Amino acid sequence: MSIRTPPRLLELAGRSLLRDEALAISTLEELPTELFPPLFMEAFSRRHCEALKLMVQAWPFLRLPLGSLMKRPCPETFQAVLDGLDALLTHRVRLRRWKLQVLDLQDVSENFWMVWSEAMARRCLPNAMMNRKPLQDCPRMRGQQPLTVFIDLCLKNRTLDEYFTCLFLWVKQREGLVHLCCKKLKMLGMLFHNIRNILKTVNLDCIQEVEVNCNWTLPVLAEFTPYLGQMRNLRKLVLSDIDSRYISPEQKKEFVTQFTTQFLKLRCLQKLYMNSVSFLEGHLDQMLSCLKTSLNILAITNCVLLESDLKHLSKYPSIGQLKTLDLSGTRLANFSLVPLQVLLEKVAATLEYLDLDDCGIVDSQVNAILPALSRCFELTTFSFRGNPISTATLENLLCHTIRLNNLCLELYPAPRESYDVRGIVCRSRFAQLGAELMGRVRALREPERILFCTDYCPQCGNRSLYDLEVDRCCC
């Protein structure tokens, strides 16, 4: 049975302050710095709004990390924080130790405040946590505005919730005093009309990561593209489920041109994810030619490409230093894989993650990529599931990974011989072939983690795995 440490005298004295209706800002100025985090938590959780307002005005650190306390935001407590900031911004209070420069509404670890409070009590909190320099966090901060608000936006409802509505209105009314910095923007379901209003409020060149997964049509994406081009510090772009059906070829060409030319302005882009994006077919070269930076990650998944698109992959210097290449779910059946071989040769010195799951690659195509694959010495993860290849081809593939000493995870398809004429996996045969293949691998090298996987089960949607024994699917 654990015994709770009794509160220290200083903590008890601090809590009594929160119950003092006549609490004055001058009293808080004399409060030891170490008491501010635990007392702020107490005031926030118990909704002592007047005390919160005063504590914000007397906050002795550069940054107020409010985000982790906003899991279940209370409008009254949030408004009290804003009222305290107003008093500072309008100089209604004069403080000897006004340090607060950043209101941080980003989502940090839930136990951040608890760890912070305990560390403060032990006098061991690193200065980097207490007084992290805000100038390092936002390229737009140059001391022009006294307060910066950091926020990550996830727009998944049709309209903004009360908390965001209150914040945006507050920022808009204090133009010139408050800089709103959004680094991460996720659009997962909101109507674009409402998204547009938000994009007009935030500083677009602060945004570093964008995810779009709203089932947009290509014309809606075209409406978004002018805003994308203003995100000059963008490092990561995720684009999913863009539908280009029901528009003429002329319109499609026009919209694709509008979108791809924005990449000319994105000179910090490092990670590009395109999932189920139908307009790439026949237009991949148009996008790649506009990339002006070297990507670390390129993911083109569940897309339809032409063979000519695959040929363009190895042409452009922007993908010559890839660490991650993910083409999973993009059908490459009946394509020549020589262009993929050329690309693998080009990125062999840097590639760490290669995913070719469910590409429809067959025996006759595999040999083309084996020489280049065997020279990807930095590879740590290789996934090749869902490709219908024979036992002999799979053995040949495994032999070409002998010298890849950095491999930590390998995922291979169950051999074609594991299935009956109806395409249903025969578990006993799969187990036998899995054991034989594992034995041959271990005779050549000691793999760290290797799995043989069946196709997806039509009943449960999972794969069966072989890792020394068969792990059945869930149905």
UniProtKB/Swiss-Prot annotation:
Keywords: Leucine-rich repeat, Repeat
Cellular component terms per the entry's GO annotation: Cul2-RING ubiquitin ligase complex; cytoplasm
Entries under SUPFAM superfamilies matching the protein: RNI-like
Lineage top rank: taxon: Eukaryota
A GO MF term: ubiquitin-like ligase-substrate adaptor activity
Gene3D superfamilies, sorted: Ribonuclease Inhibitor
Gene Ontology annotations of biological process type: negative regulation of apoptotic process; negative regulation of cell differentiation; negative regulation of DNA-templated transcription; positive regulation of cell population proliferation; proteasome-mediated ubiquitin-dependent protein catabolic process
InterPro entries to which the protein is assigned, alphabetical: LRR_dom_sf, PRAME, PRAME_domain
LRR repeats: 97-124, 179-203, 204-230, 231-265, 266-291, 292-323, 324-342, 348-375, 376-400
Family affiliation: Belongs to the PRAME family.
Protein name in the entry: PRAME family member 20
Annotated organism of origin: Homo sapiens
Biological classification of the source: Eukaryota, Metazoa, Chordata, Craniata, Vertebrata
